[in-house]
From Swiss-Prot:
The keyword Coiled coil does not apply. It comes from Baumannia cicadellinicola subsp. Homalodisca coagulata. The gene is epmA. Pfam families: tRNA-synt_2. One of its GO terms (biological process) is lysyl-tRNA aminoacylation. Substrate binds at S78, P79, E80, Y120, E253. This is Elongation factor P--(R)-beta-lysine ligase. ATP binds at R102, N103, Q104, N111, E246, L247, G302. The lineage of its organism: Bacteria, Pseudomonadati, Pseudomonadota, Gammaproteobacteria, Candidatus Palibaumannia.
């Protein structure tokens, strides 16, 4: 018997009891508000074209297919596409608690396999769904009511620029001003520079005392969201931060199948420009949109991170039985 092998869960049994209690409270919250709990596949024939997300791929072997190759399948990065197909089929308001997978870094706030809460509300606009997220957080983790700030406001406040107007030269000048120019090599990609400045200069200030909603992100950073009808430079998308941790993101969902296809193709063009293969477009999702996805808003929220805040945990492994290093 090898006594050196670590086999015990990293999280304490106490933390696992709290985890179970909070997940149960989440279910009660949504059931009491009239949402249907659904289950959708964690393995899909397609994946997201998003250049910032890296899916796990496997092969499914059917007898009628070429056996040595199999059929490519992907672990979901989110249940969004399947849930939108349910919405288009007339499900009404729905929620789901499921495992999702992203083949990316492991760290304090990241595990490749994580638990995601996702919900959708037909006929809710962005403000409606933000209000519900605010009530959800107050109910589940007993925090104060959130602060609401636009993406433009927080950049002006913490960076001193207007992110919707700033050109590449101005963004690079900000890097020099804050001694960040040696830490990033992508000086000619506006969106990546904005992301980097948000991460380094804005995010540390967010939600130190209460949650903060950042809304109206640039349209170029919003693959699945509707554009703001008054200002097409921004999309009706938001992110939620508390104590510097990104907890959730949501949006008023894009319902136009042709526009969604165009955005997917644009994202695949970026993949090719980065010497990556394009990703197969989800035709089933587009068919659902074409059939008629109702006007709706949705949210994805990381349950593990929510638990970290509740338990004042420093590492995500403290709130799950087994992280990737112990799996």
């Amino acid at each position: 018997m090898n006594k050196l092998i670590s086999w015990k869960p990293r999280a304490s049994i106490h933390n696992l009891f709290i985890r179970a209690k909070i997940i149960n409270n989440i279910r009660i919250f949504f059931i009491n508000r009239g949402l249907l709990e659904v289950e959708t596949p964690v393995m899909s024939h397609t994946t997201v074209p998003d250049i910032y997300l890296f899916p796990f791929q496997t092969n499914l072997y059917f007898l009628e297919k070429v056996p040595e190759k199999g059929v490519p399948m992907y672990l979901i990065t989110s249940p969004e596409y399947h849930m939108k197909r349910l919405l288009a089929a007339g499900s009404g308001p729905i929620f789901q608690i499921c495992h999702s997978f992203r083949n990316q870094e492991y760290g304090n706030y990241h595990n490749p396999e994580f638990t995601l809460l996702e919900w959708y509300r037909p006929y809710y606009n962005m403000v409606d769904i933000m209000d519900e997220v605010n009530i959800f957080l107050q109910t589940i983790i007993h925090c104060d009511s959130a602060e609401m700030l636009s993406y433009q406001q927080v950049f002006r406040l913490h960076v001193g620029i207007d992110p919707l107007l700033a050109e590449l030269d101005e963004l690079n000048q900000v890097l020099v001003k804050f001694n960040l120019s040696s830490t990033i090599s992508l000086y000619n990609d506006r969106d990546k520079l904005l992301d980097f400045l948000f991460l380094m200069l804005v995010r540390p200030h967010l939600g130190n005392n209460k949650p903060v909603f950042i809304y109206n992100f640039p349209a170029s950073q919003s693959l699945l969201a509707e554009l703001n009808s008054d200002d097409h430079r921004v999309a009706e998308r938001f992110e939620v931060y508390f104590h510097g941790i990104e907890l959730a993101n949501g949006s008023r969902e894009l319902t136009d199948a042709d526009l969604q296809r165009e955005r997917f193709m644009q994202e695949n063009n970026k993949q090719v420009a980065m010497n990556r293969p394009p990703r197969l477009i989800d035709e089933q999702l587009l068919a659902a949109l074409e059939c008629g996805l109702p006007s709706c808003s949705g949210v994805a929220l990381g349950i593990d991170r929510l638990l970290m805040l509740t338990l004042k945990a420093k590492h995500i492994s403290e709130v799950m039985a087994f992280s990737v290093t112990d799996a």
